[in-house]
Amino acid sequence: MSMSRLSQQDPQVFQAIQDELKRQQTKIELIASENFVSEAVMEAQGSVLTNKYAEGYPGRRYYGGCEHVDVVEELARERAKQLFGAEHANVQPHSGAQANMAVYFTILQHGDTVLGMNLSHGGHLTHGSPVNFSGIQYNFIEYGVDPETHRINYDDVREKALKHKPKLIVAGASAYPRTIDFAKFREIADEVGAYFMVDMAHIAGLVAAGLHPNPVPYAHFVTTTTHKTLRGPRGGMILCQEQFAKQIDKAIFPGIQGGPLMHVIAAKAVALGEALQDDFKTYAQNIVNNAKRLAEALVAEGFTLVSGGTDNHLLLIDLRSIGLTGKVAEKVLDEIGITVNKNTIPYDPESPFVTSGIRIGTAAVTSRGFGLEEMDEIARIISIALKHKDDEQKLDEARRRVAALTEKFPLYV
């Protein structure tokens, strides 16, 4: 990854980038929302398209000279529609949060009632957290998971929908390891006359590969990020029925954004093109296979998993059985070369800054080439580190085993 000009002009920024590259190369990345994009995606994002302003949409811009970026955005839109079977796609959102905001602005008024998943049960900030714009602007009613099974309680969702008559029901999560029944959600939404939106940010790559039910046939609106399991650049996207296309486009521009980031949209187009290839299906299947194997291996090591396992790319470890908090576990694992994030678990007695769990995902390690045997080894390393966090000899052993794995699967060389 040559950066000869940058190294000469701004050695401080260059060094920070090199340090981050080394971190990614020498550590095992298990944060469920992160992934490693292809070099083609990075080339598109680092292209001259970063210079071009293009307010508006293809064929309807407020600036001249947009004929080439129009081609790029149209490619991204058409590939998104093809990949997910959608009638309309908007690829301009800068993030998943802004994609969600645009949907809310399209159909909601200040104070309207919305049903969304409790953040501590696996939801997302933009699904009604009181510290987020969503919880401030709208009256969010929370649904959650069953205290025994840790799976979405659809009877509870229905009861709350019937009681509160929401204008919108939101499905999707940032830390839910099980398959979501979109058909059931739509049935509930129809029963109370609500719109139905799905935030598939975490599972978009699995949906694209046919490994998770596609929400597009059921939802009025589907939002997603373009990174995570989709393995594209950091950004957002909205899919919707044609009847809402003009409203959604207007909500993004001029509603909440100005000029789109054309270099990022180019990278989105490349990633969506990659996801349309047959080998992406193999990749996504390997993500799920690795997650299931890692879950089994962790259970064999004596760990407790929220809901007992996983159907997708992520799993949650309940650390209470070994007497650790998520905050401590995250720090211990980081020191031996494994990157995770502390995460609340359902009915967590700890604060969000401490937590009783950690969230683990397999998208990034799968991109790197890790397979089932490596999942077994990762489980063993995690077990050694967390059960012997004060034993420097054991921690050194864990570091050596991490190094052996990362050296076996080089990244960006």
UniProtKB/Swiss-Prot annotation:
A GO term from the CC aspect: cytosol
Site-annotated residues for Plays an important role in substrate specificity: H227
Root EC class: transferase
Any GO MF annotation of the entry: glycine hydroxymethyltransferase activity
Substrates-to-products reaction catalysed: (6R)-5,10-methylene-5,6,7,8-tetrahydrofolate + glycine + H2O = (6S)-5,6,7,8-tetrahydrofolate + L-serine
Pfam families assigned to the protein according to its UniProt record, in alphabetical order: SHMT
Binding of (6S)-5,6,7,8-tetrahydrofolate, residues: L119, G123, H124, L125, S351, P352, F353
Protein's name according to its UniProt entry: Serine hydroxymethyltransferase
Naturally occurring in which organism (per UniProt): Anoxybacillus flavithermus (strain DSM 21510 / WK1)
